[in-house]
């Protein structure tokens, strides 16, 4: 999308890791999001994608596997939310890679302000993945097999406190499922502009994505605020907790 070209880093996080699927994204240069859990067959699939698509200039690593793939293929490296960068020591471990990073979404802004390294990205917008499931909940609930799969889209899980979570499928060499908080983290209108922002647009429509990016671009440029549509079930996450 044209509006995405205004961002510093564009990350593609496909539901299906397949060269043909990724080829449909009309973007000249981007980072590939690397899942946090990979078996050898998954690594082989991602290696094939990294080799075939020259538009991939970097990887967003959510585990050590992503870091090593960046090194093997000489790609730029972004330490994503899955790396849980919690303090300056965590950042220092990777200084030789010259990489960018996302601050842990378990940190408050007070804790982030204590970092000596101020160049990280604050997770400012989007639904947070709480867990990756290697087993198949569809097989368990629907009593089906892979060759007679009964997956027909996202399913909803409710815990004992009646909190709702989406279960979304991600396919690499096999199916994985992500447990996603339905309360969208949203800091727009509350956070100051002197930061780098990580915006997770997954699950948004093209129009919602455009308005979200435009709003944050307006915020950092000091222009007129372009209000994001008010959404239900938003949260501040840990960002405004009074801990330090």
Which positions does each model-derived feature cover?
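Active-site pocket-lining/capping segments in soluble small-molecule metabolic enzymes
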Residues: 1-244
